[in-house]
Amino acid sequence: MTRSLKKGPFVDHHLVAKADKAVATKDKKPIKTWSRRSMVLPDFIGLTIAVHNGKQHVPVYITDQMVGHKLGEFALTRTFKGHPADKKVQKK
């Protein structure tokens, strides 16, 4: 189920404040955040946001195609190492 349109997008207030400050001072340093649930707003375009994936902060450069998605979508939490190889000896 999607979020009601009358509620609007959810973004943590501290993230909006940090983004506004970075835009005002033209700071290019990544903004660290643990808020994977926050939605990408048009104000964030051109900023680099370091999203926590449970182990480290992954830098994500925000483009216009990312608007409307959540930050957690761009910082993967699981590493896929591949399926185990078939160890049975094949008959010739």
UniProtKB/Swiss-Prot annotation:
Q: What is the purpose of this protein? A: Protein S19 forms a complex with S13 that binds strongly to the 16S ribosomal RNA.
Q: Does the keyword Iron apply?
A: no
Asked if the Swiss-Prot or TrEMBL record annotates the protein with the keyword Glycoprotein, the reply is no
State the family named in the UniProt similarity comment for this chain.
Belongs to the universal ribosomal protein uS19 family.
- Protein name according to UniProt: Small ribosomal subunit protein uS19
Short name of any one Pfam family annotated for the protein: Ribosomal_S19
Q: Which gene encodes it?
A: rpsS
Q: Which InterPro entries match?
A: Ribosomal_uS19, Ribosomal_uS19_bac-type, Ribosomal_uS19_CS, Ribosomal_uS19_SF
Keywords, alphabetical: Ribonucleoprotein, Ribosomal protein, RNA-binding, rRNA-binding
In the UniProt record, which is one GO cellular component term? Answer: cytoplasm
